[in-house]
Amino acid sequence: MVSLKTVQASNAGLRALPNITALFVGGTSGIGQSTLRQLARYADSPTAYIIGRNEARTRPFLSELQQLNPKGRFHFIEADVSLVRNVDAACQQILQQQKKLNFLFMTPGGISLGGRNETVEGIDYLFALRYYSRMRFIQNLLPLLEASSPSRVISVYGGGFEYSINTADLDLKHNFSLLNAYKHSITMTSLSMEHLARTHPAVSFIHVYPGLVGTNIYTNSFPAPVSTFYNYLVWPFMKPFSVDLGESGERHLFHLSSAHYPAKQGIVPQGVPLEAGEVAKGITGEPGSGAYLLNWKGDVRPSTKILAQYREQKIPQLVWDHTESLMDQAVHR
């Protein structure tokens, strides 16, 4: 476990990397908001883009960020990122304004107890938020990421919990269930990141499991009776085993900025320098491989047998080819 003291010392070193540019997708609440708050607290003159659904509700948080870092620049982009075409439009705004992007941090999602809920683009709504839209952000912004140092992508979901998936029905058009969607979102994220780290070695990719964190996800996902039951009757029993939201933000900023998780062939610097220790082992088991599975403590989660099997079968390439094809089809529907 990376101690909180080590995390905070590393985050303080972020001031030595001025003018960091970052994009937070889902940065208006929960883990994304907490991590962005820590970036504002620690970084010197950062530029941050925040993508969310409602600018009016986000204005108080934007004011808070400006107070935390008067030299920082914080830009809100209003978008429903369950649609790939909206992801493209948001990315276009950033591409027109920036020549580099150091950090891409993605947390959009939610919880559902229902069946497949297709968007107008033919993708299940939560599957889009958890996987396809996140991959579209990466695909669109790779030119900016590759022009930067440090350069890192983080997807917060279920790194280390990979399962076997139906490679003949990756988007679950014919075999949808909540469990299958959970498995596919996680495993396809890790496989795509492994592929991208190999094909874009100047960028570091991290799939992290955040642990149990006290956020408003149930309030945002369910009507009052269900969310009230969870918040007042279930959560009190779970809270002792949870990660404080502020600490989660500090730890995720460490994941974003520490040289412990470098790109495979990135330009120096690879983040805040290490005080001690070696670089982390990646998905393939190779130190510094450029793609990492982490738990909330910053520890590397061991790569599963299924990932090794899929690597031999060249499934990472298959998954990424499918992902690119489906996203391109979606925007033309």
From Swiss-Prot:
Pathway assigned in UniProt: Secondary metabolite biosynthesis; terpenoid biosynthesis
Enzyme Commission number(s) from the entry: 1.-.-.-
Keyword entries, A-Z: Oxidoreductase
Gene3D superfamilies associated with the record: NAD(P)-binding Rossmann-like Domain
GO biological process entries: terpenoid biosynthetic process
Keyword field contains Oxidoreductase: yes
Induction (free text): Expression is positively regulated by the cluster-specific transcription factor pbcR.
Family matches, as InterPro entries: NAD(P)-bd_dom_sf, SDR_fam, Sec_Metab_Biosynth_Oxidored
GO MF, any single term: oxidoreductase activity
Pfam families assigned: adh_short
Family: Belongs to the NmrA-type oxidoreductase family.
Function: Oxidoreductase; part of the gene cluster that mediates the biosynthesis of the diterpene ent-pimara-8(14),15-diene (PD). Within the cluster, the HMG-CoA reductase AN1593 functions in the mevalonate pathway, which produces isoprenoid precursors. The geranylgeranyl pyrophosphate (GGPP) synthase AN1592 is needed in the formation of GGPP, the precursor for diterpenes. Lastly, the pimaradiene synthase pbcA performs the 2 cyclization steps that convert GGPP to ent-pimara-8(14),15-diene. The putative roles of the remaining cluster enzymes in ent-pimara-8(14),15-diene biosynthesis is unclear.
Protein name (Swiss-Prot/TrEMBL): Oxidoreductase AN1596
Source organism per UniProt: Emericella nidulans (strain FGSC A4 / ATCC 38163 / CBS 112.46 / NRRL 194 / M139) (Aspergillus nidulans)
Lineage of producing organism: Eukaryota, Fungi, Dikarya, Ascomycota, Pezizomycotina
